Design a protein with these regions (language model features):
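Long, charged N-terminal accessory/stalk domains
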Residues: 1-361, 389, 396-399, 403
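Conserved, carboxylate-rich catalytic/transport cores that coordinate ions
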Residues: 2-8, 16-22, 26-33, 300-650
Length: 650
């Protein structure tokens, strides 16, 4: 397919029709609203224009509140849903109907507010539980924590490290006063909890003696009464707090019946956010508003028909070359190339004046993935997973691209599995041995085997890499000729092709004159001359070395990179065979099955991701490096935006 052609739209409309106009543009879903270029307007007009106000901040806040409320309901009152269930559908008119929006937002705010109370209750509960834990060492002490002793005696509660013995503490205390006693209340793994009783006039000296043993005075805050009394009070507070928390959670659960309405209103508010963002990009004066944006060229007739119903003036024009970096990019795909959207989006969209890589990449990506995975069993799993997901979930946009890519890659994997004779490795042959079948039972036909034909697979991978890279060069040549730069195509790609042809002829001992490979020499001369064009003096010499180095290392590196196809094919087959062999050691089908399931689950998961990553590298680095011009900005039209619902198609 191709990159969608864009038109620049400039529009002036009467203010009274602004809301209706934006609503209509949103329903069309093919216009990206941008801020007008005021520099192109006359100074007299610019001084009267002002940016339109919008409530985008409030809309974003309300949208976040609605989404948070839905997430809280899912947390406190989870809803059972079918596995791989599709999103519910609704009409676009329902999304644009905001008659119940205000009440639903209040419900969402109430849910969020109650959750904040629950979180405060949790924090308070943690504080009370911590206080109870701090009192446990003192439960055996029948003395008030806030006690002040008697008229002459002081009682001080504290603790020392568990490694300090009570005898050492008592001895240190006896050295400063004989009228004092240290009482052990309790001990745990880290601390020893003590009560010091002495005359008040001896307290300072006693504490100084105990500090040698890292004695610390216990702090109980505003606690009154014994530790046991305080613990009972804290237990009562915890019970009351748990009761209040339970009531709060029940209140949230009672609002679970509003879940679908909250989701619907979240989508309504999501759409209002898009509307408010577009409104905030407009400029206007007392009676007129100015709009500028990018529209899909193929939608121009539909747009013009809609605009004729409004009191407005507009202009549609093609972007100038200097505007290309600002023009948004949208790829137009069919069912096959749409699957590669996730790959292109992960890397980078092409520039507006570039080339759509999806149709050029699709056959190679799918073929390479199948070669690297190459197992009928794994291919069947991928096909079934993709078909079931598309049938049950009815995915759209990015999810649809993923399912389609999984399906096509699964088909390729299955076909390559037929050619290599792999069905979960050699599982059938191992099962045959366990069941006592004759030798050769379960061994599938294969055109080539990655286990025995390693060099054949490696050479084949290199040949595919050569075809892949040359395809990229052909695309580069076509694009350069289209832009009137045939000279660069001749001296750059042309010289490399002459060198490749010359190398093949030299290998076949064809075309040499006096032992000199003429075609190869001509190609090298073309390459050196093309690489030094435009350079002068010493620059020509450096250009020659640079061209030689980049060509030799670049091409050899790129070609060798395709050896990963062989490596992954071999690794997947070896790992599968190893697990099958381990499962068959005991010669028992009951032991083979769990080893088979665990081993192939791991191997499948590893290869599913590994093949994707390495295939992605071959496309984005080796292939795209020959022709791709990235840096495109995604086309983001003003449209009905949803998170929880799908819009029913007409």
């Amino acid at each position: 397919m191709a990159i969608e052609k864009m038109k620049k739209l400039r529009l002036l409309a009467v203010r009274d029709q602004k809301k209706a106009l934006l609503r209509k543009l949103m329903l069309l879903g093919c216009i990206e609203v941008s801020e007008p270029e005021l520099s192109e307007l006359s100074p007299e007009l610019r001084q009267h224009l002002a940016k339109e106000g919008s409530d985008v901040t409030k809309c974003r806040t309300d949208f976040a509140t609605l989404v948070q409320a839905v997430e809280l309901l899912d947390k406190y009152a989870p809803q059972k849903s079918k596995l791989l269930s599709a999103k519910p559908e609704t009409e676009v008119g329902t999304i644009l109907d905001d008659s119940t929006l205000a009440d639903t937002i209040e419900t969402a705010r109430r849910i969020v507010s109650v959750d904040e109370s629950v979180r405060r209750a949790n924090a308070e509960r943690a504080r009370l539980a911590g206080a109870m834990d701090s009192l446990k060492p003192w439960l055996a002490l029948d003395y008030p924590l806030d006690g002040q002793g008697t008229q002459r005696c002081a009682v001080t509660l504290g603790f020392v490290p568990a490694s300090v013995s009570l005898a050492e503490v008592s001895q240190s205390l006896a050295e400063v006063t004989e009228e004092a006693e240290i009482i052990s209340v309790s001990a745990d793994k880290t601390q020893r909890y003590l009560a010091l009783v002495c005359f008040k006039e001896d307290l300072a000296a006693a504490l100084d003696a105990l500090r040698v043993h890292n004695f610390s005075i216990a702090a109980f805050g505003n606690a009154e009464g014994t530790a046991a009394e305080n613990t009972e009070r804290l237990k009562a507070e915890l019970e009351e707090l748990d009761r209040q928390k339970s009531e709060l959670i029940d209140e949230i659960c009672a609002m679970a019946e509003c879940r679908q309405e909250l989701k619907l209103c979240a989508d309504r508010m999501d759409t209002k956010v898009a509307y408010a963002e577009a409104e905030g990009r407009l400029y206007g004066m007392e009676s007129v508003v100015a709009l500028q944006g990018w529209v899909l060229a193929r939608k121009v007739p539909e747009i013009e028909e809609s605009l004729e119903k409004f009191d407005c003036a507009w202009e549609l024009c093609d972007p100038e070359p200097e505007e290309y970096p600002e023009v948004p990019v949208q790829l137009r795909n069919n069912k096959i190339t749409n699957a590669l959207n996730m790959v292109t989006n992960m890397y980078s969209l092409p520039s507006y004046d570039g080339v759509d890589p999806n149709p050029l990449m699709a056959p190679f990506f799918i073929l390479f993935y199948g070669l690297m995975m190459a197992d009928m069993g794994y291919g069947l799993i991928m096909i079934l997973a993709a078909v079931v997901a598309m049938k049950k979930m009815h995915p759209r946009k990015g999810s649809l691209s993923f399912c389609q890519l999984l399906l096509y890659s699964g088909i390729s994997t299955f076909i390559m599995g037929i050619l290599t004779g792999g069905f979960f490795g050699d599982a059938l042959a191992q099962i045959g041995k366990i069941l006592g079948k004759p030798d050769g039972w379960g061994e599938l036909w294969c055109l080539f085997s990655p286990m025995t034909d390693v060099m054949t697979v490696l050479i084949g991978a290199m040949v595919l890499g050569l075809i892949h890279l040359n395809t990229g060069m052909v695309i580069s040549v076509v694009e350069k000729i289209k832009k009137g730069d045939a000279a660069s195509a001749f001296w750059e790609e042309g010289s490399l092709w002459v060198i490749l042809i010359g190398a093949v002829m030299m290998a076949l001992s064809v075309g040499s004159v006096g032992g000199v490979p003429v075609v190869l020499v001509v190609g090298c001369v073309m390459l050196f001359y093309g690489g030094s064009r435009g350079a002068k003096g010493f620059g020509k010499l450096t250009s020659l070395f640079s061209t030689l180095y980049n060509t030799v290392t670049g091409w050899f590196g790129d070609i060798l990179s395709y050896s990963r196809i062989m490596a992954l094919m071999l690794a997947g087959s070896v790992i599968a065979t190893v697990f099958n062999t381990i499962g068959g050691i005991a010669n028992s089908l009951w032991l083979f099955i769990p080893v088979f399931l665990i081993g192939h689950s791991l191997n499948f998961a590893l290869n599913l991701l590994g093949c994707y990553v390495h295939d992605l590298r071959l496309q984005c680095l080796e292939y795209f490096g020959k022709f791709y011009k990235d840096g495109g900005r995604a086309f983001k039209p003003l449209e009905v935006s949803t998170k929880y619902y799908d819009i029913a198609e007409d």
